[in-house]
Curated annotation (Swiss-Prot):
Function according to Swiss-Prot or TrEMBL: Usually encoded in the trnK tRNA gene intron. Probably assists in splicing its own and other chloroplast group II introns.
Name this polypeptide is given: Maturase K
Top-rank lineage group of the source organism: Eukaryota
Single GO MF annotation: RNA binding
Homology family: Belongs to the intron maturase 2 family. MatK subfamily.
Organism field: Erythronium revolutum
Cellular component aspect of the GO annotation: chloroplast
Cell compartment(s), UniProt: Plastid, Chloroplast
Gene behind the chain: matK
Record's keyword terms, sorted: Chloroplast, mRNA processing, Plastid, RNA-binding, tRNA processing
Amino acid sequence: MEELQGYFKKARSLQQHFLYPLLLQEFIYTLAYDDGLKGSIFYEPIEFFGYDNKSSLVLIKRLITRMYQQNFLIYSVNDSNQNGLRGHINYFYSHFFYSHIVSEGFSVIVEIPFSLRLVSSPKEKEIPKSQNLRSIHSIFPFLEDKLSHLNNVSDILIPHPIHLEILVPILQYWIQDVPSLHLLRFFLHKYHNLNSFIQNNKTIYVFSKENKRLFWFLYNSYVSECEFLLVFLRKQSCYLRSTSSVAFLERSHFYGKMEHIIIVCCNNFQKTLWPFKDPFMHYVRYQGKAILASRGAHLLMKKWRYYLVNFWQYYFHFWSQPYRMHINPLLNYSFYFLGYLSSVLINPYAVKNKMLENSFLIDTVFKKFDTIIPIIPLIGSLSKAKFCTVSGHPISKPVWGDLSDFDIIDRFGRICRNLSHYHSGSSKKQSLYRIKYILRLSCARTLARKHKSTARALLQRLGSGLLEEFFTEEEQVLSFIFPKTTPFPLHGSHKERIWSLDIIRVNDLVNQII
């Protein structure tokens, strides 16, 4: 453990001080809401109800003036705690904007130490800047190349910390500004009170997303800490440089971690790590779900499982049972990952071999990584969004009844095209055609409800080609790009898979089943 602690001290030498005064600078809040920051790895779209851009700038200046008062935050908390329910509601409506923009500005500030670590790296210019690394679909070509040669897989759900206070010591390694950490504890305390209040009052549930960007940053920091030790142990377990093809949004921080890894040459430490030495161990993650696959024996996977459980217990101080991390052989197991049901299939082939006058057949087996659309969970997501019933029967969307016909068709078409674009890597398209059918008929019934007619009468009057023009736009483009190898008819089946390298986030309907 002493060698490991020495490693962390060297790797975390770049720590920043005095971040708290940045909250009094207007440019921080400009960065938080600037359109140019939408490419940030922590960006989340934000809406303010009842405020335009000009009034927002005025309120930001007023907020900075109030923050110069020493007890501004203390008075806000006491005001909301003493007045009970009425105090809570008044607090949410009067201080919602102030609290929200402070948390957004604070999120930008605490990201600064992580960004400076990447900029200060001497090898930063050597890091490839390919935009394809941002695509979520770039994980699947990696799985296609690797999983067909592996034997065991473990489907892992990274547990959430029992208390958010556990996340503060993680940031203490990177940030030594004590006032900033106290402000972080203030937001965590406020969030805890907000959760207990919202459970009994659904009318103001929208405010539960007030600090979404901040808590995504904290969660990414927590998961990054898990991967920090995982990468460290992986680098110690082999003498050759490992090739990392994993893609995730916080890739810049991942590169920073990779470049700051220091080899600890100690005989006793190497003896401790010998059970984890496996050159065929692969790890991918998206959000809180990870996959650990290995070519080694089942015993090696069990050692990794108990290591992770003990690591979570002693380092993050919460309990996790080993039996919740299942280890399965790849040939008999299917797992959900990023909206796909993935598995490794065995394809037998008979090859005819002829030598001189003798000929004989050779039976050959090929392993193939296969991905299909999980139709039942996806229909469940459509049912929650009120596009169909639980059994998949299309229904109208009365909430959109006040929109124009073009807007209704455009919204349904956009959802359908996004799903088609995301699930273009499926080997079986029949499930995707069923989803398209549900959305088409739901769109027709929404238009019929608006015009007080029936879906059949509406389609007979306008023609079915009106809807097909919107829903088949992407298929026509792809058939133009791949005219010979990959036909894209409206109905039919083809097994060609296309992974799109421009998808940086999961569709909302797909995100519910991940």
